[in-house]
C-alpha cells in the first residue's frame, strides 16, 4: 500500500456522498507498499480502507479483484469485503482514478513471524485456495515466467549500478527458469502477494488476509512458494528452515500437496524470488518524483536467489512429509 494520488478533503467528502457510510470523521494516507494509493477512513459508521488504483493495476482487472473478495468473504475467509455504493456498485472514480472502499479488518501484521505463525499462514493459504475453487472468473498471471524477461529488459542496462554482476546472474537464472518451469500443477485462484504485511494476526491466529490486487489464476504451489520467500528469509538472505517446514506442514494439513507440487518447490521458490527481484528492480529505478512511497530493496531477493540456486529438493525447504 502507498500514496501516489493526493485526495483533498472536499473531493473525498463528495465521493462519500455516493455511499451510506455516515459522516467522515478522519482519513490518513498509508505509506507502506508500492502499488496503489490507500487511505484509512474513519466515518460515523466505522473504519474502512479506500483504494485508488494506480497505473500498474489495469482497470479491466478490477471486477475480478472486487468479485473475488466478495466471493471469498461469503465462503468464510477473513478478508476485506467491498462496500457497495447507493447505485449497488463497488467501483467508483475519485481524483481521476478508479476507486473502491472495503471493510477494515482487525489485527496486526508481524515483522518477525515465528515458525508457528508460518504454520498458521500455511493453513490460511490452503483455506484461501479451497475457498476460491468455485470462483467462476479467471485472470491470467501476467507476472509469471513469460513476463520476467520483458521486465528485465526494462532494467537490464542499469542493473549493475544496483549490484555488480546482477545482470549476468539474472540472465543465467532466467535461462534456467524458462526451461524448467513446471506445467499442469493443481491450480485456481491464488493471492500471489501474501507477504507478512498482507496477513493480520490476533495473538497467534490469522485474523485476516488483505491486498488481493495481484490475485490471479495459477498453480497453488507457486502461491506457497511466494510466501516461503516472503516469510522464511531475513533481509540479509538467511533462510529459516524451521519456518519453511512449518509453513509447508500447515498448508499440507489443510490441502494435501501432490508429489508433483512437492518436487516443484525448489524451482517455484526460485521463480517466485525472481519475480519479486525483477519488479522491485524496475520500481527501484523508476520511483515517481514526489511520491509518498518506500521502494523495496531488490537485493533482498537477489540474496534469496543465491540460496535457491543451491537447493536440491523440497527437503532443503524443511519438507518432512
UniProtKB/Swiss-Prot annotation:
Q: A Pfam family for this UniProt protein?
A: APH
Q: Which UniProt keywords apply?
A: Amino-acid biosynthesis, ATP-binding, Kinase, Nucleotide-binding, Threonine biosynthesis, Transferase
Q: Does the keyword Kinase apply?
A: yes
Query: Which EC class heads this enzyme's classification?
Result: transferase
The protein's Enzyme Commission number = 2.7.1.39
Q: Which GO terms describe its biological process?
A: threonine biosynthetic process
| Catalytic activity line of the entry | L-homoserine + ATP = O-phospho-L-homoserine + ADP + H(+)
Q: Which GO terms describe its molecular function?
A: ATP binding; homoserine kinase activity
UniProt KW Transit peptide keyword: no
Named in its record, the pathway it takes part in is: Amino-acid biosynthesis; L-threonine biosynthesis; L-threonine from L-aspartate: step 4/5
Q: Which family does it belong to?
A: Belongs to the pseudomonas-type ThrB family.
Annotated protein name in UniProt:
Homoserine kinase
Q: Which organism is it from?
A: Methylorubrum populi (strain ATCC BAA-705 / NCIMB 13946 / BJ001)
Q: Which gene encodes it?
A: thrB
Amino acid at each position: 500500500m502507498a500514496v501516489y494520488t493526493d485526495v483533498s478533503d472536499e473531493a473525498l467528502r463528495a465521493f462519500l456522498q455516493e455511499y451510506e457510510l455516515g459522516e467522515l470523521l478522519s482519513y490518513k494516507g498509508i505509506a507502506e507498499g508500492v502499488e496503489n494509493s490507500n487511505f484509512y477512513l474513519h466515518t460515523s459508521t466505522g473504519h474502512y480502507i479506500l483504494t485508488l488504483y494506480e497505473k500498474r493495476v489495469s482497470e479491466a482487472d478490477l471486477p475480478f479483484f472486487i468479485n473475488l473478495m466478495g466471493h471469498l468473504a461469503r465462503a468464510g475467509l477473513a478478508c476485506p469485503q467491498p462496500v457497495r455504493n447507493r447505485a449497488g456498485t463497488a467501483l467508483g472514480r475519485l481524483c481521476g482514478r478508479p476507486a473502491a472502499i472495503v471493510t477494515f479488518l482487525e489485527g496486526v501484521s508481524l515483522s518477525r513471524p515465528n515458525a508457528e505463525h508460518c504454520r498458521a499462514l500455511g493453513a490460511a493459504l490452503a483455506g484461501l485456495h479451497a475457498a476460491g475453487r468455485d470462483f467462476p472468473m479467471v485472470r491470467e498471471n501476467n507476472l509469471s515466467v513469460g513476463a520476467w524477461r520483458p521486465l528485465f529488459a526494462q532494467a537490464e542496462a542499469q542493473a549493475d549500478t544496483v549490484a555488480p554482476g546482477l545482470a549476468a546472474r539474472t540472465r543465467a537464472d532466467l535461462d534456467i527458469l524458462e526451461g524448467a518451469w513446471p506445467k499442469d500443477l493443481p491450480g485456481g485462484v491464488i493471492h500471489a502477494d501474501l507477504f507478512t504485511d498482507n496477513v493480520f494476526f490476533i495473538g497467534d491466529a490469522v485474523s485476516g488476509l488483505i491486498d488481493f490486487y495481484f490475485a490471479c489464476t495459477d498453480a497453488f504451489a507457486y502461491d506457497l512458494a511466494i510466501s516461503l520467500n516472503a516469510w522464511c528469509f531475513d533481509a540479509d538472505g538467511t533462510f529459516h528452515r524451521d519456518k519453511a517446514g512449518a509453513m509447508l506442514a500447515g498448508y499440507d494439513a489443510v490441502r494435501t500437496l501432490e508429489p508433483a507440487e512437492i518436487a516443484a518447490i525448489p524451482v517455484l521458490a526460485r521463480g517466485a524470488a525472481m519475480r519479486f527481484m525483477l519488479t522491485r528492480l524496475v520500481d527501484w529505478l523508476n520511483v515517481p518524483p514526489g511520491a509518498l512511497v518506500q521502494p523495496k530493496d531488490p537485493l533482498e531477493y537477489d540474496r534469496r536467489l543465491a540460496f535457491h540456486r543451491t537447493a536440491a529438493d523440497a527437503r532443503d525447504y524443511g519438507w518432512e512429509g
